[in-house]
Amino acid sequence: MSNESFPETLENLLSTLQTKQQNAIQSEVIEWLHNFCETFHLKIHCHKQFIPSGEKKRAKIPAQETQGNTQPSHHVHRIVLSRAQPVKAQESLLTTMCNGLVLDANTWTCLAIPPPAPFQQATRQVQHFYRNNFYEVVPIQDGTLLTIYYWDDPEHGPSWCLASTHGYDVSNYCWIGDKTFAELVYELLQQHSTCDVTLEKNKTRGTRLFFNNLNPDYCYTIGIRHHNLQPLIYDPQNIWAIQSTNLKTLKTVYPEYYGYIGIPGIQSQVPELPQYDLPYLIRSYKTAMNQAKNAIKNGKKDKGYFNYGYLLISRAPAITKSTSNVLLKSPLLVFLQKSVYQKKHNISNSQRLEFIILQNYLMQHFRDHFIALFPQYISYYTKYQNMLNMIINSIATKDKDHPFAGAVVKKVLEDIENAENIIDHTTIQNYVHQSKYAMLYLSIISHF
């Protein structure tokens, strides 16, 4: 199907879905939405009942029970549309907006509208727009983007939800440790805002937030920095406002503009920077890694020492289109995304921190950088060295019956023998330091 047959604005997308809902059952509407997403390389996340185990691209659409039944056997209430690949030049504004866009699958209206996904290259076109003063420049803050929206759950009643890039509600999700996102947001709001919010905990719904003075016709996008999510403890925790959107008119307003309706007491994202030359901006963050290391070495706990790069925000999105938000990441942010934030394995929140530290220890080109940024984990490095020394000795003696490391010894020996390598100390040492064994090591780490 050609791109011309699909809508190119959010208003047209909603109108199309609403029209189709009048003439089809929900599963057929979702089927059309799947085709839209596949055409534009987007992801669609439905209720978990619709996603079979191991299937990544396409959610299962329930079959119609009877010809007269207008509801599928497992009815979907919410859907989130997100990116499957980085933004490309010349994309439509609609596809960049599918960056955690939450839809009510009963009415096909918007529940949460996040900022557009950013373009991530300083192309000639971006440089041209920059020279002609199309962009505001703000420093990047290393945090997690969430959109707060109101939802009257058909089963459990109303509450405020937290949408992320890939989830329509992460209120009960834990990243590191046992605090949920709802608990982290509540904690930051208590410290940094004046809003009237309560936190509810129960067995049925888990942790939920209730805002007493927010307008349910709006959604509110915020950034949060909490050390359970961003463990670089020398950059303080914080919460900041990014935008709010009227869900009736689909009009978005930013904190610094007239008419902004936000969460009371939360500061704006960050002040706008002077219009430096773009090459100067890029040069200024090249030293970000060394600057951060030196600050930590000297015990400086101030966000001013941590340069994560810059965000270029267009003053004329109708002209700049898919390059309306441009993310220029510093080497420090690139390193943190690769070493800490990438979710490559299905690790529980109770083991995630251990796994992150272990992986960085095993990767020689990451090891020293990581501990320089996270010196609070130096005792973990000592523990891992003791573990690897034991594994090396057990492999050297071919102790496959070791009481708790036998499986590790067997696996590494098997890999060495399959590669037809000589089993000497150097070879063993090179093998056991490979990060591919991190999951195996995680299973025995409690013995050290």
Swiss-Prot record:
It comes from the Viruses. Belongs to the asfivirus M448R family. Induction: Expressed in the early phase of the viral replicative cycle. Keywords: Early protein, Virion. One of its GO terms (cellular component) is virion component. This is Putative RNA-ligase. It is found in: Virion. It comes from African swine fever virus (isolate Tick/South Africa/Pretoriuskop Pr4/1996) (ASFV).
